[in-house]
Amino acid sequence: MNSMFRFWIPKTSISMQLRMLSTQTRQALEQAVKEDPIVLFMKGTPTRPMCGFSLKAIQILSLENVASDKLVTYNVLSNDELREGIKEFSDWPTIPQLYINGEFVGGSDILASMHKSGELHKILKEINALAPEQPKDSEEETTKKD
């Protein structure tokens, strides 16, 4: 046999199973990230995050004053297919994952960096995803009445 036409395949790649994202799961994820302006895939819920990174992401979005009607969250711990599927969908190995207007932004470290630089606030403002600010006068009046 001519060795020029033989291909060497390492044993590990033979036993390695590559999970392909099903068409149904891919379509569901595409719809989920495009359906709402801001979508966060996280461990737990906004009121009960189940990991420090998900907590950090929620805190950053809260500091940015994201309107609650613009944000949808998905608890990846509620469904194994969702947890693994979103990692394959984004080609990003960790949770949380933030999408803005259907585009993958990143995880909690990227969010923190964008928050610190002001870039995240600028994007959120451009897409009208920020909650209306409370007038300063009403806060002062409340304090004076107490």
UniProtKB/Swiss-Prot annotation:
Glutathione binds at residues 43, 83-87, 95, 108-109. Coiled coil: none annotated. Residues 26-131 form the Glutaredoxin domain. It holds the Pfam family Glutaredoxin. GO terms for cellular component: mitochondrial matrix; mitochondrion. GO terms for molecular function: 2 iron, 2 sulfur cluster binding; glutathione disulfide oxidoreductase activity; metal ion binding; protein-disulfide reductase activity. InterPro entries: Glutaredoxin (IPR002109), GRX_PICOT-like (IPR033658), Monothiol_GRX-rel (IPR004480), Thioredoxin-like_sf (IPR036249). Its main location: mitochondrion. Induction: By nitrosative and osmotic stresses. PROSITE patterns: GLUTAREDOXIN_2. [2Fe-2S] cluster binds at residue 51. It comes from the Eukaryota. It is found in: Mitochondrion. CDD domains: GRX_PICOT_like. Keywords: 2Fe-2S, Iron, Iron-sulfur, Metal-binding, Mitochondrion, Redox-active center. One of its GO terms (biological process) is [4Fe-4S] cluster assembly. PANTHER family: GLUTAREDOXIN FAMILY MEMBER, GLUTAREDOXIN-RELATED PROTEIN 5, MITOCHONDRIAL. Belongs to the glutaredoxin family. Monothiol subfamily. NCBIfam families: Grx4 family monothiol glutaredoxin (TIGR00365). This is Monothiol glutaredoxin-5, mitochondrial. It comes from Schizosaccharomyces pombe (strain 972 / ATCC 24843) (Fission yeast). The lineage of its organism: Eukaryota, Fungi, Dikarya, Ascomycota, Taphrinomycotina.
